[in-house]
């Protein structure tokens, strides 16, 4: 395996930023983020711009490639628009390879720290196409081109099925994380049992009502911290690798500082059960 950066405590998410992508990625790197999450899915990401920001930071001597943790994803055609990073007529395994090579070009690198299946092609059990994509991703790990591999937007049953068939175990699972669903508690538990690191995204935007509740606001006031700081501290304390996509330099600073914040067990329990009646 290629030696690279340690797995970071937080990832900067680059989705939904369009023409601001390069500038915000550069700002995140300047603020101290070393983990960058993107996808070769032009519908929601602008990976070329992410790559430009990374290359500029390296060229300026602000960071080295070895200090960066770069994560991209393969997205099936159903999750793409017309701007595909692969030949849609090619076999799925070839699509994975083409998407991966394109991501390498975007970052001007010869490896990725993490390469993730962006979501299954099926809603129920994993399909033959899902398995074919996973085998192609495993091959990238086996060749050393991807240091770690993982999946995203998987249900509990899909993750259980994958763990049963994987030759190379997934290192990461990335899901949107809802307080009203126990912060994906069952999936997090299965991840912990199998050494899979749970990456949580939309921790703030998916939980506005819960974070506006009286108990949580009282906790923020008592601790003198923002809702974002406490949510990211909570995420780290329960074993998550959180993503933040903030566009504010000040919030970037606070999100990084929150990683050192420690919560009392009772406060962790309060946040864990915010949506419990």
Regions found by a protein language model. Give the residues of each.
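N-terminal binding-site loop/beta-alpha segment at the start of enzyme catalytic domains
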Residues: 1-72, 132, 136
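Acidic (Asp/Glu)-rich catalytic clusters
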Residues: 2, 27-30, 51-69, 104-110, ...
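Active-site mouth loops of central-metabolism enzymes
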Residues: 8-20, 82-94, 122-127
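Short, acidic/polar
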Residues: 17-29, 89-106, 157-160, 182-183
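A structural motif
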Residues: 33, 109-112, 146, 170
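Structural motif corresponding to the early beta-alpha repeats
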Residues: 66-93, 118
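Active-site groove signature of glycoside hydrolases
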Residues: 105-125
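Beta/alpha (TIM)-barrel catalytic core signal, keyed to glycine-rich beta->alpha loops juxtaposed to Asp/Glu
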Residues: 119-277
């Amino acid at each position: 395996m290629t030696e690279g950066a340690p797995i970071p405590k937080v990832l900067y998410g680059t989705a939904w930023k369009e023409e601001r992508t390069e500038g915000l990625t550069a700002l995140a790197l300047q603020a101290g983020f070393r983990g960058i999450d993107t996808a070769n899915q032009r519908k929601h990401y602008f990976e070329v711009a992410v790559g430009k920001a990374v290359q500029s930071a390296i060229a300026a001597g602000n960071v080295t490639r070895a200090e960066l943790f770069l994560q991209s994803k393969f997205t099936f055609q159903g999750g793409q628009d017309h701007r595909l990073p692969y030949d849609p007529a090619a076999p799925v395994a070839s699509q994975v390879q083409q998407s991966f090579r394109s991501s390498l070009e975007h970052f001007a690198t010869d490896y990725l720290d993490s390469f993730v299946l962006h979501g299954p092609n099926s809603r129920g059990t994993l399909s033959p196409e899902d398995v074919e994509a996973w085998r192609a991703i495993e091959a990238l790990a086996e060749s050393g081109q991807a240091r770690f591999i993982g999946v995203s937007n998987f249900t509990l049953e899909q993750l259980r099925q994958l763990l049963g068939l994987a030759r190379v175990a997934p290192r990461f699972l990335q899901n949107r994380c809802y307080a009203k669903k126990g912060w994906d508690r069952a999936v997090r538990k299965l991840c912990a049992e199998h050494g899979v690191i749970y990456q949580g995204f939309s921790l703030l935007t998916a939980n506005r009502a819960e974070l506006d509740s009286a108990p949580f606001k009282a906790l923020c006031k008592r601790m003198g911290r923002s809702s974002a700081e406490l949510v990211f501290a909570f995420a780290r304390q329960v074993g998550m690798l959180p993503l933040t996509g903030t566009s504010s330099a000040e919030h970037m600073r606070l999100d990084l500082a929150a990683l050192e914040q420690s919560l009392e067990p009772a406060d962790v329990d309060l946040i864990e059960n915010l949506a419990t009646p």
